[in-house]
Amino acid sequence: MEERESNVLGTAPIGRLMLKLAVPAVAAQFINMLYNIVDRIYIGHIPEAATLALTGLGVTFPIITLVSAFAAFAGQGGAPLAAIQLGAGKKDQAERILGNSLALLLMTAAVLTVGFSAFKEPILRAFGASDATIGYASSYIGIYLLGTVFVQLALGLNTFISAQGKAMTAMLSVLIGAVLNIVLDPIFIFVFQWGVRGAALATILSQAVSACWVLAFLCCPHSILRIRRAYVRPDPRVMGKIAGLGVAPFIMQSTESLVTVVLNTGMQTYGGALYVGSITIIQSIMQMIVMPTQGITQGVQPIMSYNYGAKNYRRVRQTFKRLLAVTMAVTCSAFVMVALIPGVLARIFTPEQELIQLVSRVMPLFFGGIWAFGAQMACQSTFMALGQARTSLSLALLRKVILLVPLALILPRVTGSVMGIYAAEPIADILASATTLTLFLSQRKKLLPTEKDAPKG
C-alpha cells in the first residue's frame, strides 16, 4: 500500500496531481500565515495602544523569522532528500533522514530558546525597539520563545508529511493550530486583557497542538515515513546532507530578519515612526501574497523530487512548466490587487487614517515588481527539489542580500527621500527574477536531459 501511494507521484496525471498536492499546501501556508497575521490584526486594534503595540510586535519579526528559518533548515533540508530516496525505492534511508531532521530540530530549539532569552532586550533594541516600544516587544517575544520547540517541530516535521504526498494531512496539521489561535487570540487579548502577552500565549499553545498532531501522524502506521527511535540518533553524514540542502531555505527565511531590520531602521531615520508602521503593514501584506505562492511550490516539490529520483526527467519538465505558469498567474494577480485596493488592505491592520493614507500611497510602488517574483519562486523551488544546494543558495542570496539590502541602504541616501527605500523592493524583484530564470534555462538541459540530449551508452 505504501509503495502504491508513493508511486502516485510518478504515475498520476500531472495537472490533477498538482491540484491535489498544491491546493492543500496553499491552504496550509495561508493558514500558517494566520498565526502572525491574526496577532497583528488584533494587536493593531488594542484600545489606546494600537500603534505602539503593533510597532513593538513588528520589532520582534526578525527573531520570529529566525526561529522559523531554523525549522526550514532541518525540515526543508531533509524532506526533499527523503522524497528522492523514496523515489529511488530506499525507504530506510528516507526514514533515517527523517530521524536526523527531528534530532536537528530538537537541538536547534534548545539553543535558540536559551540564546534569545538570555540576550532578549539588547537584541530587540538592535532590531529597532525604542523606549516606547521595548515593553511590548519584550512581553511578546519572552512568552513566544518558551514555545520555540513547538514551532520547530510543527513547521519542520510537517514538510515530511508533504514529502510523501499526503498534502491534506499536512494542511490539517496547520489548520488545527491556526483555528485554535484565531479563537484564543481575542479571548486572551481582550476578554482576559492580557494584551500582547495573550497574543503570544495563544500562538505557542496553538503551535503545541500542531506539533503533537504532526508527531502522532509520523509515528502511526498510516504514514509512509515513520519516526523510528534508532534513526533519531544523530548521524554526522546524514546531518551534513540535510544541512547542505537546508542552507538555502534557511537563508531565504533568515535574510527576512536582515531585511526587516534594514527597512525598520531606514524608515525611522528618513521618515519617522509613522513610516515604520507603514512598512510593518506592507510586510504583512507581502507575507499574505508570498506564503500562498510558497505553498504552491512546496506542494509541487514532491512530484519533481520523486520523478527526479526515478530519472523520469520528462515528467519533471512538464511539472516545472505548469508550476511556472501558476506562480506567474498568482503574482501578476497580486500586482493588480495592490494597485487597485491598497486602502482596503491597509484597513485590515489599522483604523488610523493617517497611516492608511500613507500605506495606500506607497504600496503600489513597493509591489511594483511582484508580478515577476513568480518566476524566481518557481525556479528556486525546482533547484531545491532537484537537490541543487549550491545553486539554491546562490539564488537565495541574490534577491535579498545582494540586491535588496544594498538598494535599501543606498537609494534613500542618493535620493534624499524615504521613498528610495520603498523603491528598492521592485528593483530587486525584477532583477532577481530575470537572473534566476535565465540561470535555470541555461542549466535545464544538463539537469533534465531529453532523450536526444542524454549521453549515449
Residue ranges and their predicted role:
Residues 19, 34-35, 62, 74, ...:
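Residue-level signal for transmembrane alpha-helical positions in Major Facilitator Superfamily
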Residues 51-62, 138-141, 200, 273-288, ...:
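Small-residue hotspots at the loop-to-helix junctions and early N-terminal turns
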Residues 9-49, 62-77, 81, 85, ...:
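N-terminal transmembrane alpha-helices
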Residues 144-162, 170-178, 199-212, 294-297, ...:
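Short runs within selected transmembrane alpha-helices of multi-pass transporters and secretion channels
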